[in-house]
């Protein structure tokens, strides 16, 4: 049984509302990759966009590696995930206000987004926007697999 998603399905899934898990090589002390949850945005055919502090560990490691991975998943059955990996294709410093607002509104209702932006105004001036072009896609949709057990 092929669990891979079609191109259209994987792009639609990645564009949906999920907290992403960012992965980037962390060569310090011979450790494994840095994996952290974060907000992201994606439009089919475009880059994955993340925001992070200019001097954050994430930003420093991404600058060093020149690429990163991002995984989004459904945490309830039927389980699905999309994982993308690719090179950084753009950095905007500072993070444009319109992008800050769009990202907050993606994850929060309008009132909560406005409160979040106001409360974090000082921190957000230190944020940058990083864009990654997905080159490698890994996907799985366990819907059909789950249907076999239901019938």
Where are the regions that the model predicts?
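Charged, gly/pro-rich active-site loop segments
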Residues: 1-5, 82-151
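Short, basic/aromatic recognition patches
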Residues: 2-21
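A generic secondary-structure signal marking the coil-to-beta-strand transition
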Residues: 10, 18, 46, 80, ...
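Short secondary-structure boundary/capping segments
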Residues: 11-12, 40, 60, 120-122
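A generic structural signal for nonpolar/aromatic side chains embedded in well-ordered alpha-helices
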Residues: 14, 61-62, 103, 132
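Short beta-strand segments
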Residues: 17-54, 62, 68-72, 81-84
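A short, aromatic/hydrophobic, helix- or strand-capping loop or linear motif
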Residues: 24-26, 72-77, 110-119
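Short, surface-exposed beta-strand-loop junctions and turns on beta-sheet-rich folds
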Residues: 56-58, 77, 146-147
């Amino acid at each position: 049984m092929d669990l891979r998603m079609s191109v259209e399905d994987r792009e639609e899934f990645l564009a949906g509302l999920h907290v992403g898990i960012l992965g980037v090589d962390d060569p310090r002390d011979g450790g494994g990759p840095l994996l952290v949850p974060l907000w992201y945005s994606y439009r089919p055919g475009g880059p994955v966009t993340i925001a992070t502090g200019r001097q954050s560990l994430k930003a420093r490691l991404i600058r060093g590696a020149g690429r990163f991975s991002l995984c989004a998943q459904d945490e309830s059955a039927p389980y699905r995930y999309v994982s993308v990996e690719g090179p950084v294709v753009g950095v905007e410093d500072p993070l444009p206000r319109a992008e800050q607002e769009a990202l907050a509104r993606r994850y929060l209702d309008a009132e909560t987004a406005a409160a979040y932006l106001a409360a974090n105004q000082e921190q957000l001036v230190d944020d940058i926007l990083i864009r990654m072009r997905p080159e490698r896609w890994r996907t799985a949709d366990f819907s059909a697999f789950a249907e076999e057990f239901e019938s």
